[in-house]
């Protein structure tokens, strides 16, 4: 973890109830009914950016994810029911129902299939949104049900059929997913960047959230590495987060960063550049904690990995990455 000690398939504000987000630039987008307030527009741009960077990481590394490969549709959905004033937000976005397209990867599978930001989603496959039960004290649960259904469809069939509302009536769109490693990327709350084994969540207050794309991708790659290396499962199987093991898993995630970045189309050096920019500003905090190597040591480990990649002429981490020897008795599949 980078922020504290602790899809790009489809996501929503299940835990964090983040503000809605959408794509920028050339992404197909329906005009909101009214201009969005600056705070909402800013968070929408953040969420779209994280979606895009996560998509690049998961799809770029898909051929090396032998244990956790799925397909990505390159979109985020959100549910107005998960927000404090969902009715007002729904009107602002011009939605005809509660579930809408929050963001699209520019040029990604969903956009190529004809989906638009702020499309109203009526059904996922054969599951009608209106038929999903929702408890008043768990209004976030509906978007999780939708997410799970979408992920199951993409895993089983490689496609995601959606029905959306259009002026001429409901339109069924079938999205052909792109092979991807299994991890969702989403905006959460606060100032942390964390991974839980299946998701990468970064808060809008994270100090590096406004860094350049390559450096923010490095942050996401670090958390993504925790998922790919099954660190959460390893801790669960070996008695929790003991300091020595935490230090080694953090080092292992650091070392995998340049491999993941290279396969996503970024310069692997961005991993070292992130720590060189971040470390001096935060050197008295987590980067000098005994559970983590110092930021300058982390740069050295990354530079060694880049040299190894250059010597190999390959970024195939599934074959060439050398795992740390973790001090536990229970092995975990995929490590």
What are these regions (language model features)?
Residues 110-138:
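Conserved PDZ fold ligand-binding element
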Residues 2-12:
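Bacterial N-terminal signal peptides
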Residues 17-80, 87-95, 141-142, 148-156, ...:
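C-terminal capping/extension segments of zinc metalloprotease domains
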Residues 25-38, 127-128, 198-204, 233-241:
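Acidic/histidine-rich, surface-exposed loop or edge segments in extracytoplasmic proteins
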Residues 218-231, 253:
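Active-site recognition of the HExxH zinc-binding catalytic motif
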Residues 100-103:
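Short beta-strand segments of a lipoyl-like beta-sandwich/carrier module
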Residues 105-109:
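Short alpha-helix capping/helix-loop boundary micro-motifs
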Residues 214, 230-251:
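Post-HEXXH active-site segment of zinc metalloproteases
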